[in-house]
């Protein structure tokens, strides 16, 4: 059975908040991320038939070495991507009391905590500041 779809792209990300800060990452292999070098929320494509919240848990484990955490779906975006494929992005959110110790995977070039009021400028964020837009939507409580 074919499990790769070229018509749709399903992506999950996680906005991880702790101590008034949010975690952003840069990926080592830009080719896997639309040749974007800027900051992202930790993200990945959904595995075949994977639930978006389970994808959030997997992303935290695989990319950041965090286990036992269960991010919750905050909102969904639907749009046509640069490739022409229909993109659905599932934005998960998790608030922690304390910053966890990260064990970053080799896929990440960098993981950095940013104060919520001192986020990087839009030009430094991948996809024209998309992570900033997602965080803004979460802050406004728009779902």
Model-predicted segments: where are they?
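Active-site-adjacent beta-strand/loop module that shapes the phosphate/pyrophosphate-binding cleft
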Residues: 18-20, 77-101, 134-137
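Flexible, glycine-rich phosphate/dinucleotide-binding loops
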Residues: 23, 31-32, 80-82, 120
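Conserved N-terminal beta-strand and adjoining loop/helix that marks the start
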Residues: 1-24, 45
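Conserved Nudix-box catalytic region and its N-terminal flanking loop in Nudix hydrolases
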Residues: 21-62
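A short coil-to-beta-strand element that immediately follows conserved catalytic motifs
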Residues: 67-75
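Short connector loops at helix/strand junctions that flank enzyme active sites
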Residues: 9-11, 17, 36, 41, ...
């Amino acid at each position: 059975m074919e499990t790769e779809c070229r018509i749709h792209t399903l992506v999950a990300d996680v906005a991880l908040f702790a101590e008034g800060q949010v975690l952003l990452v840069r990926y080592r292999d830009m080719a896997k991320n639309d040749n974007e070098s800027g900051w992202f929320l930790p993200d990945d494509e959904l595995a075949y038939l994977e639930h978006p919240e389970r994808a959030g848990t997997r992303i935290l484990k695989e990319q950041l070495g965090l286990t036992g955490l269960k991010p919750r779906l905050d909102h969904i975006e639907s749009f046509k991507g640069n490739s022409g494929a229909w993109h659905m992005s599932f934005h998960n959110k998790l608030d922690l009391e304390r910053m966890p110790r990260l064990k970053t995977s080799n896929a990440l070039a960098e993981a950095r905590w940013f104060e919520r009021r001192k986020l990087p400028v839009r030009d430094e964020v991948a996809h024209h500041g998309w992570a900033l837009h997602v965080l803004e939507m979460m802050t406004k409580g728009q779902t």
